[in-house]
C-alpha cells in the first residue's frame, strides 16, 4: 500500500507544470500557445523572460528530485519504490492530470530524478547536456544525446544492470527520445530552433 501511495503521490507531484504555473504567475502567455507549444523551460525562454525560464527549469528539476528523494528518505519499497517513483513523476510531467495531460518533454524532470537516484549520475548527464548545448546551441539535440548516455553512465559508472532503478533510467531515456521525435525530424531538416531563439510557430 505504501508503494502504491508513493507512486500516486509522485505522479501528482510530476503533474505540476511549472512552465504553465510560472508563466501565469508572471503574467506571461501560456507556453502551450507559442513556439514549440511545449510547456518547458526552453520554450518559456522564447518568451524573452529569462527569469521565468530559470524558475521553470528549477521547478521541473526539483519536483523530479523531490519525488524520488522522499521515497529514498523514508525507505518506501526499496529499489522498486525508487524505480516506480522515478517513472511516475516523469510520466506526471509528460501527461499531467492537472493540465489535461498536455505536458512537457521531461528533460529537467529527468535530470532531477537522476540527481536523486545518484548525484554523480545526474551531474554526468547534466554535463553532457551542457556540453552539447554549448557547442551546437540546440536544446533538443543536447537532450537526445544526454538521454542516450544516461543509461550508459548508469551501467559503466555504477555497474547497475539488472535492477529496477536501471530499468527505470532506461525507460525514461526511451520515453524522452520518443517525446522528441518531432525535434529529430526538424534537426534532420535543418529547421530546429536554437536555444534562446524566439519563434511564434513551429519548433
From Swiss-Prot:
Q: What is its main location?
A: membrane
What topology does the record note for this protein and the membrane?
Multi-pass membrane protein
Note the Pfam families from the entry: G3P_acyltransf
Q: In which pathway does it act?
A: Lipid metabolism; phospholipid metabolism
Q: Which GO terms describe its molecular function?
A: acyl-phosphate glycerol-3-phosphate acyltransferase activity
Quote the cellular component terms of the Gene Ontology held in the record: plasma membrane
Query: According to the lineage, what is the superkingdom?
Result: Bacteria
Where do transmembrane segments lie in this chain? 3-23, 51-71, 74-94, 116-136, 140-160, 164-178
User: What does it catalyze?
Assistant: an acyl phosphate + sn-glycerol 3-phosphate = a 1-acyl-sn-glycero-3-phosphate + phosphate
For this protein, the Enzyme Commission number is: 2.3.1.275
Extract the NCBIfam families matched here: glycerol-3-phosphate 1-O-acyltransferase PlsY
Q: What's this chain's function?
A: Catalyzes the transfer of an acyl group from acyl-phosphate (acyl-PO(4)) to glycerol-3-phosphate (G3P) to form lysophosphatidic acid (LPA). This enzyme utilizes acyl-phosphate as fatty acyl donor, but not acyl-CoA or acyl-ACP.
Q: Which family does it belong to?
A: Belongs to the PlsY family.
Q: What is this protein called?
A: Glycerol-3-phosphate acyltransferase
Q: What is the species listed in this Swiss-Prot or TrEMBL entry?
A: Burkholderia pseudomallei (strain K96243)
Phylogenetic lineage: Bacteria, Pseudomonadati, Pseudomonadota, Betaproteobacteria, Burkholderiales
